[in-house]
Amino acid sequence: MRQKIVAGNWKMNGQIQQVTELVSQIEKLIGFDCAAQVAVMPPSIYIPKVRDCLRTGKIVVGAQNVYPKDYGAYTGELSAPMLKDFDCRYVLVGHSERRQFFHEDENFVAQKFHHVKDHGMIPVLCVGETLSERENGKTEQVIAQQVLAVSAKGKDCFRDCVVAYEPVWAIGTGKTATPEQAQKIHQFIRDLVGEINDSDAKHLTLIYGGSVNENNAKALFSMPDIDGGLVGGASLNAKQFVEIVKCIN
């Protein structure tokens, strides 16, 4: 079901005191009726602590990564059943940093995507082009390849999931796509999914990630196919993050 979402990806930041203070501050500041589902995605070791700190029901917890097997000899990895034990609702798959630094290809991302869905959680499929791909006119080609990679399991594969458009050139750089640039790609993704399943395309939640902050969020979220944001650096500041959440109202 299409809904408004603002998710904070904390990446590899914070230790236990900082994480505890951050989630408590965010929850305290969200003392208003929020139009969006708010999620925080801490480093995996702190997921239980963050979950236990939540009191109001206005914030849910998510995970930044998952391994696509239920159990086994995969040293250092976490499975979807493990994440589900700690009430994770959302799981990122295909984030550009995983693709870049850990060489995760389309097939592996697709395995993660379906592993998360098979265990009743919501995968957040991250897609996006590099600066060179954009400059060479390959944006739509790259996005289509990344989106369609998960579609092999049938026409219902985009039901109950989120797609996050995160142009790689805008992540952590301070640069951001204009609202019009982001809208164009979000509409392209919705149309692409519509070729597989029109009903699921209409109900698909599409969010934007790429240097989202309190200054650009309102304009981005006003676009017809942008349903929220995947927030990086700004989510590490409680006040800034909540200001972004307010922009969805």
Swiss-Prot record:
GO terms for molecular function: triose-phosphate isomerase activity. Pfam families: TIM. Substrate binds at residues 9-11, 172, 211, 232-233. The keyword Acyltransferase does not apply. One of its GO terms (biological process) is glycolytic process. The keyword Cytoplasm applies. Pathway: Carbohydrate biosynthesis; gluconeogenesis; Carbohydrate degradation; glycolysis; D-glyceraldehyde 3-phosphate from glycerone phosphate: step 1/1. It catalyses: D-glyceraldehyde 3-phosphate = dihydroxyacetone phosphate. Its main location: cytoplasm. GO terms for cellular component: cytosol. Coiled coil: none annotated. The active site is at residues 95, 166. Keywords: Cytoplasm, Gluconeogenesis, Glycolysis, Isomerase. Its EC number is 5.3.1.1. InterPro entries: Aldolase_TIM, TIM_sf, TrioseP_Isoase_bac/euk, Triosephosphate_isomerase, Triosephosphate_isomerase_AS. It is an enzyme of class 5 (isomerase). Belongs to the triosephosphate isomerase family. HAMAP family: TIM_B (MF_00147_B). Homodimer. This is Triosephosphate isomerase. It comes from Legionella pneumophila (strain Lens).
